[in-house]
Design a protein with these regions (language model features):
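Active-site His/acidic residue clusters
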Residues: 257-273
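Hydrophobic h-region of N-terminal signal peptides that target proteins for export
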Residues: 7-16
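Sec-dependent signal peptide recognition
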Residues: 1-7
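Non-catalytic accessory regions flanking glycosidase/transglycosidase catalytic cores in CAZymes
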Residues: 15-239, 244-253, 277-278, 282-503
Length: 503
């Protein structure tokens, strides 16, 4: 039925004057779309680890304690890189508590989230999990209460091949070969007063510089992520400038974090958060360029290593946010911003993976997939390897003293497949938008594949046994191409990926 509707809508529009235009040009590239944009995050928080990806003794778990049903859902999600162990948790975490025989690991009071930590899941369990799901591991060191020695010893434990104390401890714990962990975070949100071991920018930069030096002396091949500001109510720009200027020769990324909300119950305002996301990226990109003003600058990129919708569930609910259809639309908004800035945003990690502000929810009998799960999968799959500039002219609405187009667009290109992907979020609550899609270079063929999320109830959610209603539809159509362009209607409050072929 969906396919028939798509044909009828497209055909009916041919006689109309389109309200919007999108121009694509395969020669106008932005940069490579890094696979690490499709990452995720696993923190010791609520039921993210225990009862989420790991549940010893469960009939749904394997002999190592990993939930196999969850693992299959995670594999299908396409997680390219997984950040661990936090988050706020990392600022009070002693990684040595989480290695060795499980029955001998200490139970600790966990200060960040006011819980008890059994430490039955630690470094080896995490790294084996990333191997099982095919993801790069990304470890965040304790930049709050931790020391430089803690950080370098952790690198030695995971990456050293010679017979050293910590490498031999790894062997004793059942792993002979190094894990070769490439990505390391130099602490989490250290600018935030809520953080254990909170520091000002100067003190953080001194710590991070010494940690980077010591960690790279253990393994010179690692990539390091500085803790960018997440405290947007303070001088976040000044923090990032100070950190970048101090660490410009020692880091590979600086982090950004953003959580958005729809407390005002205003869809168009909610989906207009892209204004701020673009601003955060572009302002930080400017600070990077300023720090690189000297000769032979080291490349530095942005790791957007925490992002999501989060405002309903708090600590009392263990952050178990129930997502709806409008939140699924917001996933497209975030990814469109990341793709539009693919030259500088080279990593992104949705927070988080299971149960805690997550696309996957579990109980002891099984799981269900939240509506946000599906756009995450498709943005990772339905894409080219290069981001394109997409020129957009569309009806607008006023938000934060600026005119914002109702359609939010990004585009990617695969030269190998002659495929152009056009990602379009229609932010309008009520208006379908007829759009002429114009190709500027090469010949546009009439073959179009369509992936789309559209549902009448913006607040529709999923639950156990009922997670098949707010799901994407796929179809193909034969477009009426005229002058290297065609018209397509993007339904109100919808997210669409069009796959075009350009010869």
């Amino acid at each position: 039925m969906h396919r028939i509707l798509v044909f009828l809508a497209s055909g009916a529009l041919l006689a109309q004057t389109p309200a919007a235009r999108i121009k694509i040009d395969i020669d106008r590239t932005i940069g490579e779309v890094d696979p690490l944009l499709f990452g995720n995050f696993a923190e010791h928080l609520g039921r993210m680890i225990y009862g989420g990806i790991y549940e010893e003794g469960s009939p749904l778990s394997d002999k190592d304690g990993y939930r196999t049903d969850v693992m299959e859902a995670v594999k299908k999600l396409g997680v390219s890189i997984l950040r661990y162990p936090g988050g706020n948790f990392s600022s009070g975490y002693n990684w040595t508590d989480g290695i060795g025989p499980k029955d001998q690991r200490p139970v600790r009071v966990e200060l960040a989230w006011n819980d008890l930590e059994s430490n039955r899941f630690g470094t080896d369990e995490f790294l084996r999990y990333t191997e099982r799901i095919g993801a790069e591991p990304y470890i965040c060191i304790n930049g709050g209460l931790g020391t430089v020695d803690d950080a370098r010893h952790w690198v030695e434990y995971t990456n050293e091949s010679r017979h050293t104390y910590w490498a031999d401890q790894r062997r004793k714990n059942g792993r002979d070969e190094p894990y070769h962990v490439k990505y390391w975070g130099l602490g989490n949100e250290i600018d935030g007063p809520w953080q254990l071991g909170h520091k000002n920018a100067e003190d953080y930069a001194k710590f991070a510089l010494e940690a980077a030096k010591a960690m790279r002396l253990v393994d010179a091949s690692i990539k390091l992520v500085a803790s960018g500001s997440s405290n947007y109510g303070a001088d976040w720009i000044g923090w990032n400038r100070t950190v970048l200027n101090a660490l410009r020769n020692d880091i590979d990324y600086i982090s950004l974090h953003t959580y958005i909300n729809n407390r005002d119950n205003d869809l168009e305002k909610f989906l207009g958060w892209s204004q701020r996301i673009d601003y955060y990226i572009e302002t930080t990109a400017g600070a990077i360029l300023s720090a690189q003003s000297g000769p032979n600058p080291r490349p530095i990129y942005i790791a957007y290593d925490e992002w999501n919708v989060w405002y309903r569930a708090g600590n009392n609910d263990h952050l178990e946010e129930r997502y709806n259809f409008e939140d699924a639309l917001a996933m497209g908004m975030f990814f469109n911003s990341f793709v539009r800035h693919a030259d500088v945003v080279k990593m992104a990690n949705l927070a988080q993976l299971v149960n805690v502000i997550a696309p996957i929810m579990t109980n002891k009998q099984g799981l269900f997939l939240q509506p946000i799960y599906f756009p995450i999968v498709e943005y990772g799959k339905q894409r080219g390897n290069v981001a394109l500039h997409a020129w957009v002219a569309a009806p607008t609405y006023s938000l934060n003293h600026h005119d914002l187009p109702y359609i939010d667009v990004s585009s990617t290109y695969s030269a190998k497949d002659h495929a152009v992907y056009v990602n379009v979020l229609n932010r309008s609550k009520s208006q379908d938008i007829a759009t002429r899609i114009e190709n500027q270079e090469g010949t546009l063929t009439p073959d179009v594949a369509v992936w789309q999320m559209n549902y009448p109830d913006l607040k529709a959610t999923h639950t156990f046994g009922d997670d098949k209603k707010v799901v994407p539809k796929t179809s193909t159509l034969t477009a009426t191409v005229s002058r290297n362009s065609f018209v397509y209607t993007f339904p109100a409050h919808s997210l669409t990926i069009l796959r075009l072929r350009v010869e």
